[in-house]
Amino acid sequence: RQTAGYAYAGKNVIIVNMNVFYLPNAEIGMISFSEEESRHCVKVLRMQEGDRFCVTNGNGSLFDGELVDAHPKRAVACLSNPHSGYDNRPFNLEIAIAPTKNNERTEWFLEKATEIGIDRVRLFTSYHSERRAANVERFRKVMISAVKQSIKSKLPVIDDVVPFSELISQPFDGQKFIAWIDDDVRLQLCDAYIRGSNALILIGPEGDFSKEEVDSAIQKGFVPVSLGDARLRTETAAVVSCHTINLINQMKIAL
């Protein structure tokens, strides 16, 4: 018999020994899983009626769940005891990234950023982009898997691909950075970012941004920053940016 375990640290709920399922718009009461989640629950995990687990709705809530009908195509569960806001953060983090030529590298970034903590991913094309389109639905599935693996209550938003000029014109309330490899850029992201602030960080394609694109971004209020001395792949730079912002906000002393 599989059981769910909870531990409490102050206001935070720490969930242990838990299988997690994703069900948009989940609420208290009887629910039916999708065929995909039903198959995973009954066939892969071999869960039985009476087994307990957790359900995330991707919108800020986690629920206790108990399997009522172990049907392999339409499993039914009873949800109760919602845990809302346990992983809320006082800041918003968005990263805009040019999809990599190899889709697996972009998917790797999406997985790791979701695990670490991110609110939104914006996709764009620029002058040096090698990929002009992206399978956003496939990317979203990668993020859903990461949400379940890392027991997150919120599913990050991922936007369709837009041109760079449109991206930098989109509104954002917070600090705006553009990561750029240039000898004249000495300001480090970790020094430029103000703890607790919302942040939007632009990460360029394999060939980096063009000088004209950087100038356009600066005119729109973006600040050029460095991520360190090493030359990083696009997806690595994006993960480093994500981790930097999260780490600064998790520090117990103000930076």
Feature roles, as predicted:
Residues G29, E49-D51, S61-F63, K73-A75, ...:
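A generic structural signal for short beta-strands and their flanking turns/coil linkers
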Residues Y86-F177:
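RNA substrate-binding interface of SAM-dependent RNA methyltransferases
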Residues P82, S126-S129, D229-A230:
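Short, ordered loop/turn segments at secondary-structure junctions
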Residues Q2-S84, E137:
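N-terminal positively charged helical leader segments and presequences
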